[in-house]
């Protein structure tokens, strides 16, 4: 019937099309079955869900292919043995990386001749003349940068390698930030050292070769201010009474009675002191240094210091005990140029200060520098960069945070902020913003302090 109506030719074409349609449908069904079995579609879902899963599968695969290529490249890079390229291999995890792998000590240290006495360098006897000539020839670098305002270089530093505990370097960063803030406010230059200039003078004594080198390299400096890395400024407004020291070459926190009469090894502190740049200072360094070389010399000197100084424990010679011994036994040679400062805290022992910060805030104000508001809080014995300290780690770190925030609040108040508490890293706003910011009053006078250096072109030698 169909053939009569459509004709034989058309009928054969329709039959051929139907057969092709059957084959197409069969192929489609087979494709769906294969996809459902290989990519996980069809888990009791509807055809619509199957279609969504198929789309997601191909989309995820398309996104994953570039990552797979990168992973293959990184894997290939890990197996390479390049010397310094960006893909030289190794883990991306800083926490698990052994930092000691990148430290290379090139060659052995040069050993000194044991038959020769130790010296910091060639003997210099005319430094005052050399320095005076230099200052006269370089008037743009005066040693006094304001009336009774000497040019001062604050020097501090730390070891060339990272600290021996996970948080030590963080506290070193806080300490140097604190010192930078004080120096910026008071017109003081700063030098941070991380190099051991003389292997023989490691530990307590490392400061001596550095101090001598800086004095000779910077004749424009009138005073060098050494400060240990574990000491922090806690009175940002206190300006040192420079006029008081016009006739002195060395200023240390201490007491005459404890040093000269009692010979007490803690009668002064060498963690924060001022040294004038002159011939007297070079002579003092030359006299101070011979107890410092590590090994037998330092050990034997330690025995002498323990025997001669009051209450000193038995340990190798340290720079502080050596200074007490030097002043007590050679007072006529050095004492008349040494000022032992007890009027304010050029060094303030942290154990008697940190628990009183809130009381200070309530009753006193910055700018006093003494027990009411200490200029410096020194964390003697905490050793935040070492493996072990002399005090509980938790107490040391908590109090170092409090001391930092105590000083930092004086900086933040300039800009209208303060720490939420002395124990908090977070800050809060303490005054509202204004469209006339220059009319805001700086309560502590630290934004443009009167004591900040004003450069003049006159030399005072």
Swiss-Prot record:
Q: Which EC number applies?
A: 2.4.2.39, 2.4.-.-
Tell me which GO cellular component terms the UniProt record holds: cytosol; endosome; Golgi apparatus; Golgi membrane; Golgi trans cisterna; trans-Golgi network
Describe the inactivation phenotype: Reduced xyloglucan content.
Please give one Gene Ontology molecular function term for this protein. Answer: xyloglucan 6-xylosyltransferase activity
Asked whether the keyword Disulfide bond is assigned, the reply is no
Q: Which Pfam families match?
A: Glyco_transf_34 (PF05637)
Q: What class of enzyme is it?
A: transferase
Q: List, alphabetically, the InterPro entries matched.
A: Glyco_trans_34, Nucleotide-diphossugar_trans
Q: Which domain of life is it from?
A: Eukaryota
Catalytic activity line of the entry: Transfers an alpha-D-xylosyl residue from UDP-D-xylose to a glucose residue in xyloglucan, forming an alpha-(1->6)-D-xylosyl-D-glucose linkage
Record field: transmembrane: 21-40
Choose any GO biological process term that the UniProt entry carries and state it: polysaccharide biosynthetic process
Does this entry carry the keyword Coiled coil? no
Lumenal side residue ranges read 41-461
The UniProt annotation puts the region (Disordered) at 74-95
Keyword annotations for this protein, in alphabetical order, are:
Glycoprotein, Glycosyltransferase, Golgi apparatus, Membrane, Signal-anchor, Transferase, Transmembrane, Transmembrane helix
Q: Which residues lie on this side of the membrane: Cytoplasmic?
A: 1-20
Query: Where found in the cell?
Result: Golgi apparatus membrane
The way this protein sits in the membrane is described as:
Single-pass type II membrane protein
Family in the record? Belongs to the glycosyltransferase 34 family.
| Function in brief | Xylosyltransferase specific to UDP-D-xylose that accepts both cellopentaose and cellohexaose as substrates, with a better use of cellohexaose, to produce xyloglucan. Adds preferentially the first xylosyl residue to the fourth glucosyl residue from the reducing end of both acceptors. Transfer one xylose mainly to the second glucose residue from the non-reducing end. The acceptor should have a minimum of four glucose residues. Associates with other xyloglucan-synthesizing enzymes to form multiprotein complexes for xyloglucan synthesis in the Golgi.
Subunit annotation: Homodimer. Interacts with XXT1 and XXT5. Interacts with FUT1 and XLT2.
Protein name stated in the entry: Xyloglucan 6-xylosyltransferase 2
